[in-house]
From Swiss-Prot:
Organism, as annotated: Saccharomyces cerevisiae (strain ATCC 204508 / S288c)
Record region (PY-NLS nuclear localization signal): 209-239
Top-level taxon of the source organism: Eukaryota
Start and end residues of each stretch annotated as RNA-binding RGG-box: 209-228
Subcellular location, principal: nucleus
Record's compositionally biased regions (Polar residues): 510-525
Cystines in this chain: none
Function: RNA-binding protein involved in RNA processing and transcription regulation. Acts as a regulator of mRNA stability: binds the poly(A) tail of mRNAs and pre-mRNAs, preventing their degradation by the exosome. Involved in the biogenesis of circular RNAs (circRNAs) which are produced by back-splicing circularization of pre-mRNAs. Involved in mRNA poly(A) tail length control and nuclear export. Functions in surveillance and the packaging leading to generation of export-competent mRNPs.
Protein's name according to its UniProt entry: Nuclear polyadenylated RNA-binding protein NAB2
Miscellaneous information on this protein: Present with 9670 molecules/cell in log phase SD medium.
Region annotation 10 X 4 AA tandem repeats of Q-Q-Q-P: where it falls in the sequence: 121-156
Region spans: Disordered: 102-160, 196-236, 503-525
Family under the similarity heading: Belongs to the ZC3H14 family.
Composition bias, Low complexity: 103-160
Length: 525
């Protein structure tokens, strides 16, 4: 709930409370808005009451203080999750009950005036408007003697508040009987939980400003009340009782001792805000503790061994989770997912890397984990990784491929550069052999590797001595003979003569003497 909602709800609650004030003729909405403005600006109960008392003389200071206290308690109830409708309904019930009990209160005041003739004679000149302020100071001293039988039904309600009442503030405004608040842990905790907070009253009394005698312990000092303030003065607030809260005159609260052990401890989800005690220390009165086993707000060593073991195990689990959390923050998560550098423009359907959600091409992948819906994800704010979008739709590539060049028209002419040509798209034939093709210029094979005549005149003309030259030469060119050529190299092989003429005399070979060495070996043996 935002601050504006708190303010609007508080205006409605304060206006409902002002509607219950008798003979209040001012604009209720305007006054409620002014009170809420004072509270929002940091005003306390005392400062707000002083401001209202200076503006509205027809309303008693106690009534204004009750309205301001109700506003503070309503604000705290709203912060604790109470609905504004519930608070308004309770205020309406209290207003209706207060109107019904107004006649009874007047009769009681008349009886009190009749039983106090001496006090009435001693103060004949007092104004009627000051009488409600002086009665709370005079009645506590004479109440045991003058009112022994009055209000027998309200004594059980006032008994729990008597230890907190001072000698000058013992008589309080009668409040309607309301049912006690139901604990959220009924049936779980043995003892009923008291109010969670105990108020600390640091403000002066509204009925007396600096007046009255100052006692021995009233001046500022060790053990006394500083500044003459009475810290024992309390004020009952019906709204606080109806909402299960402590009704006091200030909003400064300090935690008090909680009664009743929480049965959910050490696994209680409320933690420190639990209205019941969480035992963490050893009982000082053990083994003479009067409370039954399992109900004391502190630990008993021999009785709560299982609880101590459970507490230790819970503490170890908490420390382990804390250490794991710190380690996870320090160490980056290793998920094995690598983001695609092309992102939503990736045109590879089988790309193994991560891509943004298909519902938003401008999204970024922040969580390095795969999305469960993958390509069917419809969340435009999804921060997980997905497969390539080219699987479900056509993605235009970032750069289009260059068109292939048109095919080169081949020519049957011979390239004059031969094997030294550097043009990769040369359209002429290139000979790899210096031997002239047997077909010559009539060869039609585009991939022929033999030489072919070149339609260009040789620059050496008739004097060209290169027998493998493919250029055109004028008539009269004389080719040199090949070095080392046989004299009859131009004669066909079938006409070549044999090595010996036909009439040559062939002599027999001399006899062989290969056995002489064998004979010498036998003689030596």
């Amino acid at each position: 709930m935002s601050q504006e909602q708190y303010t609007e709800n508080l205006k409605v609650i304060v206006a409902e409370k002002l509607a219950g004030i008798p003979n209040f003729n001012e604009d209720i909405k305007y006054v409620a808005e002014y009170i809420v403005l004072l509270i929002v600006n940091g005003g306390t109960v005392e400062s707000v009451v002083d401001e209202l008392a200076s503006l509205f003389d027809s309303v008693s200071r106690d009534t204004l203080a009750n309205v301001v206290q109700t506003a503070f308690f309503a604000l705290e109830a709203l912060q604790q999750g109470e609905s504004a409708e519930n608070i308004v309904s309770k205020i309406r019930m209290m207003n209706a009950q207060s109107l019904g009990q107004s006649d009874i209160a007047q009769q009681q005041q008349q009886q009190q005036q009749q039983q106090q003739p001496d006090i009435a004679q001693q103060q004949p000149q007092q104004q009627p408007q000051q009488q409600p302020q002086q009665q709370p100071q005079q009645q506590p001293q004479q109440q045991p003697q003058q009112q022994p039988q009055q209000q027998p039904q309200q004594q059980p309600q006032l008994q729990p508040l008597q230890p907190q009442l001072g000698t000058q503030n013992a008589m309080q405004t009668d409040a309607p009987a309301t049912p006690s608040p139901i604990s959220a842990f009924s049936g779980v905790v043995n003892a009923a939980a008291p109010p969670q907070f105990a108020p600390v009253d640091n403000s002066q009394r509204f009925t007396q400003r600096g007046g009255g005698a100052v006692g021995k312990n009233r001046r500022g000092g060790r053990g006394g009340n500083r500044g003459g303030r009475n810290n024992n003065s309390t004020r009952f607030n019906p709204l606080a009782k109806a909402l299960g809260m402590a009704g006091e005159s200030n909003m400064n609260f300090t935690p008090t001792k909680k009664e009743g052990r929480c049965r959910l401890f050490p696994h209680c989800p409320l933690g420190r805000s639990c209205p019941h005690a969480h035992p963490t220390k050893v009982c000082n009165e053990y083994p003479n503790c009067p409370k039954p086993p399992g109900t004391c707000e502190f630990l008993h060593p021999n009785e709560d061994e299982e609880l101590m073991k459970e507490m230790e195990r819970t503490r170890e689990e908490f420390q382990k989770r804390k250490a794991d959390l710190l380690a996870a923050k320090r160490k980056p998560v290793q998920t094995g997912i690598v983001l695609c550098k092309f992102g939503a423009l990736c045109s590879n359907p089988s790309c193994p890397f991560g891509h943004p959600t298909p519902a938003n091409e401008d999204a970024k992948v922040i969580d390095l984990m795969w999305c469960d819906k993958n390509l069917t994800c419809d969340n435009p704010e999804c921060r997980k990784a997905h497969s390539s979008l080219s699987k479900i739709k056509e993605v235009k590539p970032i750069s289009q491929k260059k068109a292939a060049p048109p095919p080169v028209e081949k020519s049957l002419e011979q390239c004059k550069f031969g094997t030294h040509c550097t043009n990769k798209r040369c359209k002429y034939r290139h000979a790899r052999s210096h031997i002239m093709c047997r077909e010559g210029a009539n060869c039609t094979r585009i991939d022929c590797l033999f030489g072919h005549p070149i339609n260009e005149d040789c620059r050496f003309g008739v004097n060209c001595k290169n027998i493998y030259c493919l250029f055109r030469h004028p008539p009269g060119r004389v080719l040199p003979e090949k070095k080392g050529a046989a004299p009859n190299s131009n004669v066909p092989t079938n006409e070549r003569p044999f090595a010996l003429p036909e009439n040559a005399i062939i002599e027999n070979a001399p006899p062989q003497t290969s056995f002489t060495h064998q004979e010498q070996d036998t003689e030596m043996n």
